[in-house]
């Protein structure tokens, strides 16, 4: 059976030079960077039967097991080496998440991934700055017109022309492949950080707020890779709970 994500993009890539799909990973984490993945699928990509076979199990990265994601990641890299597609990742640091907030940092990571995929493709696709109305220029020639799609709603702070597709990683092959690149790239980074900071169990939770991660934050405090913006509510709640416990202990001492 043909992957419905393949069919979705194959149909909509008509009358265009191809599709660029972009997604992110790590937006809701307590630690580590936010990473974006960009996949450029030239229109000829959909004319090669071997490519369809290679993409048969591509899906939203969140719907895949870790070993499935890693195998598909390797397949995407291999397709890139064969010049069937172009891929890139970009990231925004914890410091940038703090200064730009998570939305701004996500846009920054996406922008970097898009710029890098343009470089890797030797300018086959070039970023187009948004027009005043933010819409695609329908007068462009087919050879120049690329469908640029990001997962979710359009990003106001992303400066390049694009469209947003709600739950796009469940519809679009290019976006789903971008989500795999972003997720595996980020997971690899968090596993490396886990060797340096074993208390937080980054290799398992990848920076999300698992019970073990939260217990380590309570006992060890945050490290340099934690996001201050994301920890404030947690730390404030912990301090409030501690004050309540202390008050209760004080009251009990008078009984």
List each language-model region with its residue ranges.
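RNase H-like, Mg2+-dependent phosphodiesterase core
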Residues: 1-255
């Amino acid at each position: 059976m043909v992957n419905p994500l393949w069919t979705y993009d194959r149909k909509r890539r008509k009358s265009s030079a191809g599709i660029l799909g972009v997604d992110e990973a790590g937006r809701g984490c307590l630690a580590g960077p936010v990473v974006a993945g960009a996949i450029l699928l030239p229109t000829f990509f959909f004319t090669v039967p071997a490519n369809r076979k290679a993409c048969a199990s591509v899906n939203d990265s969140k719907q895949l097991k870790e070993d499935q994601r890693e195998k598909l990641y390797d397949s995407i890299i291999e397709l890139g080496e064969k010049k069937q597609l172009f891929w890139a990742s970009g990231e925004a640091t914890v410091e940038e998440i703090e200064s730009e907030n998570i939305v701004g940092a996500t846009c920054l990571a996406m922008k970097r991934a898009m710029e890098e995929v343009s470089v890797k493709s030797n300018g086959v696709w070039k970023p187009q700055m948004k027009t005043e109305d933010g819409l695609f220029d329908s007068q462009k020639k087919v050879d120049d017109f690329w469908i640029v799609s990001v997962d979710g709603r359009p990003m106001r702070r992303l400066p390049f022309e694009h469209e947003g597709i709600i739950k796009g990683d469940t519809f679009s092959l290019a976006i789903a492949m971008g989500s795999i690149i972003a997720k595996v790239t980020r997971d690899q980074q968090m596993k490396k950080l886990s060797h340096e900071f074993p208390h937080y169990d980054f290799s398992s939770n990848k920076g999300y707020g698992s019970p073990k991660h939260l217990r380590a934050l309570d006992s060890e405090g945050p490290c340099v890779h934690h996001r201050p913006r994301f920890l404030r509510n947690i730390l404030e709640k912990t301090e409030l709970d501690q004050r309540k416990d202390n008050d209760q202990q004080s009251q009990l001492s008078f009984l």
